[in-house]
Structures are given as C-alpha cells and as structure tokens.
Amino acid sequence: MASVTLKNVCKAYGDVLISKNVDLEINEGEFVVFVGPSGCGKSTLLRCIAGLEDITSGDLYIGEERMNDVEPSKRGVGMVFQSYALYPHLNLYDNMSFGLKLAKADKKEIDKRVEQAAEILQLGHLLERLPKALSGGQRQRVAIGRTLVSQPKVFLLDEPLSNLDAALRVQMRAQITKLQRQLGCTMIYVTHDQVEAMTMADKIVVLDGGFVSQVGKPLELYHYPENRFVAGFIGSPKMNFMSVQIVDVESERVQVKLSNGVTFWVPVDGTTVNKGDRMSLGVRPEHLVSSAQGDAVIDGEVMIVEKLGNETQVYLNLESADADVIYRQPDTLDVDSGDRLEIGIPAHRCHLFHSDGRACKRLFNEKGVER
C-alpha cells in the first residue's frame, strides 16, 4: 500500500491543456474514484499516475518518492483497462502468471500468488480454461487477478466495467468493492458512471474540463455540492434547476421568488447574495414532496410518467425550470400524461447557485454527513 500525491499537475498535448493544476492527496488504503463526463481528463490523469503519459508540469509522488521520471514498471502500480487484454491462446493460469514469468519469478512463488488471487476472485476451478470459455464478468476478474498477482502498491482501474451488461456491472461493482476492503489496498478507479462512484468510493474526485471540481465523500457531494456542475452530475435522476429572484437576504437564510410569484425562505449562507439577484434554485427529484407538505407549491403539465413498480418518476413541464422538472416518489403514483399535478418544495432540501455556478453554503444538517 502507498499514498498518492499530485501537486499542481498539468498535462498538455501540444497547446491543448487536458489536466489543469490538479492537487490531490490519496491516502494509503483509500478507494478513490475519478468521475466526470467524457473528455474531462480522468483517464489521462490515471495514465499520468501509471507513467503511460508524461506529466507536463507539477509533481507526482507515490509514497515519499517523486515519480515524474520513474518508468512505469518501477512505480509499483498495477493497471486494469476497459479492454480485458487477455491472451486468447493461454489458459487462466498462464494469463495471470504471465508477468511474473516474464520477470523470472520463482515457480513456487508464482503458484502461490496465482492460487491466492484465484481464491480471492473465485476463479480456482477455472484456471485451465481459455478466455473464450468464460463470461464477461469472469474475464474481467481474470484481468483483475493478473494485476493482483503482481502485488502492486497502488491499483489503477480505467472503466473496467464498461463492457459488461447492467446486471453484471452491479455484481462486479460489489465484488471490486469487497476485494478492495479485503486487501486494504490503495485503489484509484475511473468511471463516467456516478452510480459506480457513489456506491464504491471512500472519496470521489469530480473532474470537469480538466479541473478538479470537488473532492469529498459520496454523501458530501450529494448533499453539499460546491457548484452547479457537481450538483447536476451527482445524483440520478439529476437535480432540478429553476430560475428564481432574490427578494430578501439575511445572514443565514435567503428569500426567493419563483416564476409563479410564490416566495419562501431557503436556509443557506446569505453573505454572498444580494437583493434582486437572479439565481438558480436546485432541488433533487427525490426531495420534492406532496403539495400539502411543501413550503412552496409548483404545478405543471405531466409530460411523461415512468412507473417502475418500486417508484414513479414524473416529468412536469414548468416554464421557470431549465428542463422538465422530475418528481420521484416511492411506490406507484396514480397520474398520467396530460394531467396537471401540484408538488411541494421543501425549503430545507433546496440548493442555491450564483450565475457563475458557485453554490451558497447549505445550513441544514443532513443525516450521515459530518461537517
């Protein structure tokens, strides 16, 4: 195990800057997930840590050692790619032991490591099979096992579940999390799927356009996003945003007016807000309530209803919203397309964002989050 530290790291291809002034501290034994949309620089950053890409400027440390000029094979990292990259003519044992054989490791040591990895990954009964005889999930476990036998100080995983179907992704998600807890290893995992990030990570790094947008525990990012990008990216379905006008301001609450003229107080830090400002009000679909329970009521035409059995998602057309407002309720809701529906907004679950995307600090204390 080892810590990983990035100090003002930048990566450029010619004049195009991909990773921009990245500062990160990843502790020993921590499971960290890099998440963000396509093209945000998350895989590039992982490849810089692995040594597959040169760092343009800044410093990378693994443990106490500066790694900028150290070749990949000597960094003590192991990498699992989106592609399984298994040798089709070799059985599982030979695939998993290939790197150790290349390094001329002792035969007994090779056998010991492969057997241990196979036991952990539940592959012991498959060691004589060729990759073509395996399922997608089993092939992915072999790829992880090949990295595991090299006993790296840091595991790097670049979108390892992207090629799997939805049900298998859920299963492998749990297995990788269990493996990391069992080994206590330092693991850095790249994904564009915020659900993977929320369910697996000790700490999430949200990337946007090469910059680190926010770093924190999953529930910190969910309940207390520092900007509108993180608020909209973390959570599924995404957060609803509505344009509001600021009517009054106090140090620990702000009065907002919706497009329908309804006003209510939102418990946020008001020190950066001015009367008359136009701002974005954010509220998550699962935090909306019935009209009787809300501090403010909005109504709109029902456009789409998704009845999933365990929950219902309703898409409402609302003039003041940036897109259809999504209302999410457990169980089945008796509503159909074309109906008018009133829903309530609970003030204490609301977020408030400046025009430049900065969030006002929320003052309501959510369960499960240390502040």
Swiss-Prot record:
Positions bound to ATP: G36, P37, S38, G39, C40, G41, K42, S43
Catalytic activity: D-maltose(out) + ATP + H2O = D-maltose(in) + ADP + phosphate + H(+)
Database matches in InterPro entries: AAA+_ATPase, ABC_transporter-like_ATP-bd, ABC_transporter-like_CS, ABC_transpr_MalK-like, ABC_transpr_MalK/UgpC-like, Mo/tungstate-bd_C_term_dom, NA-bd_OB-fold, P-loop_NTPase
Enzyme class, first EC level, given as a word: translocase
Segments forming domain ABC transporter: 4-234
Location in the cell: Cell inner membrane
Record key words, sorted: ATP-binding, Cell inner membrane, Cell membrane, Membrane, Nucleotide-binding, Sugar transport, Translocase, Transport
Main location: membrane
Topology class, membrane: Peripheral membrane protein
MF annotations from Gene Ontology: ABC-type maltose transporter activity; ATP binding; ATP hydrolysis activity
Recorded GO CC terms: ATP-binding cassette (ABC) transporter complex, substrate-binding subunit-containing; maltose transport complex
EC number: 7.5.2.1
Gene3D superfamilies: 2.40.50.100, Nucleic acid-binding proteins, P-loop containing nucleotide triphosphate hydrolases
Family (UniProt): Belongs to the ABC transporter superfamily. Maltooligosaccharide importer (TC 3.A.1.1.1) family.
Role according to the record: Part of the ABC transporter complex MalEFGK involved in maltose/maltodextrin import. Responsible for energy coupling to the transport system.
PANTHER family: MALTODEXTRIN IMPORT ATP-BINDING PROTEIN MSMX, MALTOSE_MALTODEXTRIN IMPORT ATP-BINDING PROTEIN MALK
Quaternary assembly: The complex is composed of two ATP-binding proteins (MalK), two transmembrane proteins (MalG and MalK) and a solute-binding protein (MalE).
Name of the protein described by the UniProt record: Maltose/maltodextrin import ATP-binding protein MalK
Annotated organism of origin: Vibrio vulnificus (strain YJ016)
